[in-house]
């Protein structure tokens, strides 16, 4: 089986239900995930080391994790509702916040200060640097059309062609994972295995006939 590295979102942890859901959807894959340090400089350093050590076949990041995943060059990657504007996303969350999932370090709450928001705002300036044509073919973005938190489809699409809207909100629920994420994983898997499945593109006009 293949190895997938999962990069969690803000106020989450490696104990996120998303990890369990992905494992159930892909029983033959090995899933690796770790708690990300709160400060972005420490976060990216840890994730880069982890990617080098684990050598995953695929990296999947959601929300804040999608922002980090864009920076992990040299791997096939899927970003789900990536929070490239973390400073803006966090600015409505100042004060004490609780982690939604247990962390290994036992910390269960976080103070979101102006300083921390500035750290993220400065850090996200690094996104979209030095993108090669090869990288453009290795990064897929999935974007919920009803996401109340993050609106980064256009920003992503300026840099990467493989931007895919889906019907859903911010969280990666199993229905979205099954209908949108799994097919993309399958495309990547086929590409890695040197297989091409026949893909039929059906134009809306082809369906829009006297029956509709």
Could you tell me what each predicted segment is?
Residues 76-196:
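The alpha/beta-hydrolase serine catalytic core
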Residues 1, 56, 138, 197-198:
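Local beta-strand N-terminus motif with an aromatic residue
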Residues 60-70:
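Gly/Ala-rich beta-loop-alpha elbow adjacent to hydrolase catalytic centers
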Residues 70-76:
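Glycosyltransferases and closely related glycan-assembly transferases
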Residues 1-53:
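Active-site catalytic motif of lipid deacylating hydrolases and related acyltransferases
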Residues 199-212:
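Alpha-helical substrate-recognition element adjacent to the catalytic core
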Residues 6-10, 60, 142-144, 202-203:
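Short hydrophobic segments within beta-strands
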Residues 57-60, 76-78:
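Residue in the alpha/beta-hydrolase core beta-strand immediately N-terminal to the catalytic nucleophile
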